[in-house]
């Protein structure tokens, strides 16, 4: 199973704010930050975009870290109720 890390990239002279999603193999996507969405939704969209780019299927669940968020694929049998 893959994990996806998403992090916020602040604006520069050349780019507005962005969210970058990466995996441990170096695959990545960078998405513009949509100010009409909240931070969770922006991070989630970037994680989903990377998963789609790589052809990965499944349900993603995310949690916050000091650097952004980490997303993992979950199965219902592992759900804690």
Positions of predicted regions on the chain:
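Catalytic phosphate/metal-binding cores of nucleic-acid and nucleotide-processing enzymes, i.e., regions
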Residues: 1-81
């Amino acid at each position: 199973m893959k994990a996806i890390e998403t992090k916020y990239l602040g604006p520069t002279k050349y780019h507005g704010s962005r969210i970058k999603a990466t995996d441990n193999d170096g695959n990545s996507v960078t998405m513009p930050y949509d100010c009409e969405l909240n931070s969770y939704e922006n991070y989630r969209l970037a994680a989903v975009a990377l998963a789609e780019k790589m052809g990965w299927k499944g349900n993603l669940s995310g949690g916050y870290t000091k650097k952004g968020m980490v997303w993992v694929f979950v199965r219902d049998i592992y759900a804690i109720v």
